[in-house]
């Protein structure tokens, strides 16, 4: 009964999701709250003195032929702006995008996160909100999910899905299924690599994407899609694969660059709406398939204890719409992101064979044989594997940064910044500075290990550790931390361990410009990894 009440409350709340105009009014209301009169605030410089970019000059630089920023990747552009305007500057809104403050100063990061409020407002994903709130409102009926929503509707949705997705015991159900996916991934590599050079083909990223989509689908859709097998070339799964790819390719131009899509239905907006329609259609079909399967089991008297019920099954018990929208959010947020993170990790390990060798020593204890099964107990003791993943995320960050709308007045870099201000937190420069990470240019997983003398501590205790914990937050911070964090971590850990147990991995090509910026960083070079077989 409690679950039913929660679902009804959620649906009512989500149906009240803020429209774009309403969100702006909410931000204005927040900006008038809790005026500060303390000494820090009074001694700070006025907000108006923050370096500012002229709207027309910025538009020219970003979009006109010969403009300084026109042909730059997103991360390159933000670094160029930092060099031009300093560690903190104010950017005007262009073509309907809100104006925002951009800070590269790590001292500001904690201040922003500590002033994010009860329901943190994370700007962005306006095209996805448009699709769910306006374009296909008849389907979503106010249930918008976790990605594009703000305020209480977002908080209510997270309250329902958090107990299912963030509980370690629920994620552990997928060890065996993900192990099967990883076995198929290894077999696919054996089939695809050149028999003479042992190198993967130029388009190996396609195989990595198939592996990540297959892995996420095990959780989101309670189903293996068969994407790592040749027999599914024309399947619905392959359609989903291409729709997700299209979503990431097109979104960057509408979300991050000047575009009149809010005023006229541009070709790219129509293209994105078709991709989102496709994701919705295929996901709904798979959810309906799961419902039929569960109904059939119920008629046959099959009853599983709660600790054996899948994530999708538990969400369906809350509400079908909630389960469907959450599945879509997991697919959109969990495929290209994991693929890019995994690619960065493989490149780091391939270019640092001594680190790969140390990792293999640890993995051999978990997987004595190539086909050994993962166990919950053995995967509790893989600190170097987790350290390798973290260090690769530091060297190859997935996104430019994070963003929040201040819920309270704050002082950033010595300036008064009023509540309601959009703030973009950009740690790119700090992630590779010795000031924050000693020997920052090197791949040193050891910086994330706890020293034996400090084994009870939650933080690294050695000379390589970060000097500011708010510089490196790959899964975000606070209530808006990635809801799929545990699933992604398990996917990366199991996939990497299986690959390193089966192969010695080399990459005998340059890695300059290995990634390009879209909504996230995406691989930009042929991933011709060399996979050398290891003895069983």
From Swiss-Prot:
Pfam families per the UniProt record, alphabetical: p450 (PF00067)
MF terms in GO: heme binding; iron ion binding; monooxygenase activity; oxidoreductase activity, acting on paired donors, with incorporation or reduction of molecular oxygen
Record flagged with keyword Nucleotide-binding: no
Reported impact of residue 252 to T: In strain: Subline 5 and Subline 7
Domain of life, per lineage: Eukaryota
Compartments in which it is found: Mitochondrion membrane
EC id: 1.14.-.-
Cofactor dependence: heme
GO biological-process terms attached to the record: response to insecticide
Family membership noted in the UniProt record: Belongs to the cytochrome P450 family.
Note: Bari1 transposable element insertion in the 3' end of the gene leads to ten-fold more abundant expression than in flies lacking the insert.
Function of the protein: Has a role in resistance to insecticide lufenuron, but no other insecticides.
Protein name (Swiss-Prot/TrEMBL): Probable cytochrome P450 12a4, mitochondrial
Originating species: Drosophila melanogaster (Fruit fly)
Record gene name: Cyp12a4
């Amino acid at each position: 009964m409690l679950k039913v009440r929660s679902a009804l409350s959620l649906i009512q709340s989500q149906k009240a999701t803020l429209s774009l105009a309403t969100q702006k009014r909410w931000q204005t209301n927040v900006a008038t709250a809790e005026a500060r009169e303390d000494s820090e605030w009074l001694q700070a410089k006025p907000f108006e003195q923050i370096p500012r970019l002229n709207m027309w000059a910025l538009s020219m630089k970003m979009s006109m032929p010969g403009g300084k920023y026109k042909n730059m990747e997103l991360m390159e552009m933000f670094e160029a702006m930092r060099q031009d305007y300093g560690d903190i500057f104010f950017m005007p809104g262009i073509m309907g995008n809100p104006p925002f403050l951009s800070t590269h100063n790590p001292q500001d990061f904690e201040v922003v996160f500590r002033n994010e409020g009860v329901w943190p407002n994370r700007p962005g994903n306006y095209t996805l909100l448009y699709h769910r709130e306006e374009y296909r409102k008849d389907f979503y009926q106010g249930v918008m999910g976790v990605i594009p929503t703000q305020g209480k509707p977002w908080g209510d949705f997270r309250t329902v899905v958090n107990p299912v997705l963030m509980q370690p015991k629920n994620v552990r159900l997928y060890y065996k299924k993900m192990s099967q996916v990883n076995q198929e991934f290894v077999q696919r590599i054996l089939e695809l690599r050149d028999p003479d050079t042992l190198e993967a083909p130029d388009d190996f990223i396609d195989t990595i994407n198939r592996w990540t989509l297959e892995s996420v689908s095990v959780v989101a859709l309670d189903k293996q899609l068969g994407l790592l097998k040749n027999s599914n070339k024309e399947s619905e799964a392959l359609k989903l694969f291409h729709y997700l790819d299209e979503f990431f390719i097109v979104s960057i131009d509408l979300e991050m660059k000047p575009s009149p899509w809010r005023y006229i239905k541009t070709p790219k907006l129509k293209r994105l709406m078709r991709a989102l329609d496709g994701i919705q259609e295929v996901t709904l079909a798979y959810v309906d398939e799961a419902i039929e399967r569960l109904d059939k089991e119920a008629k046959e008297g099959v009853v599983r204890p709660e600790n054996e019920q899948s994530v999708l099954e538990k969400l369906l018990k809350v509400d079908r719409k909630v389960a469907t929208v959450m599945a879509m959010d997991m697919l959109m947020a969990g495929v290209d992101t994991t693929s890019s993170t995994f690619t960065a990790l493989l490149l780091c390990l391939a270019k640092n064979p001594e680190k790969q060798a140390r990792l293999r020593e640890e993995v051999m204890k978990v997987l004595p044989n190539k086909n050994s099964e993962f166990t919950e107990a053995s995967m509790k003791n893989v600190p170097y594997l987790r350290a390798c993943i973290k260090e690769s995320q530091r060297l190859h960050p997935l996104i430019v940064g994070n963003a929040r709308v201040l819920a309270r007045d704050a002082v950033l870099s010595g300036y008064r910044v009023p509540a309601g201000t959009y703030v973009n937190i950009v740690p790119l420069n700090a992630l590779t500075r010795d000031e924050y990470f000693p020997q920052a240019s090197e791949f040193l997983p050891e910086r994330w290990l706890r020293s034996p003398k400090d084994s009870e501590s939650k933080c690294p205790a050695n000379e390589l550790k970060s000097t500011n914990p708010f510089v490196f937050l790959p899964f975000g911070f606070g209530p808006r931390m990635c809801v799929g964090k545990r699933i992604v971590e398990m996917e990366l850990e199991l996939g990497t361990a299986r690959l390193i147990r089966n192969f010695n991995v080399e990459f005998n090509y340059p890695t300059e410009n290995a990634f390009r910026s879209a909504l996230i960083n995406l691989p930009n070079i042929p991933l011709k990894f060399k996979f050398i077989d290891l003895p069983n």
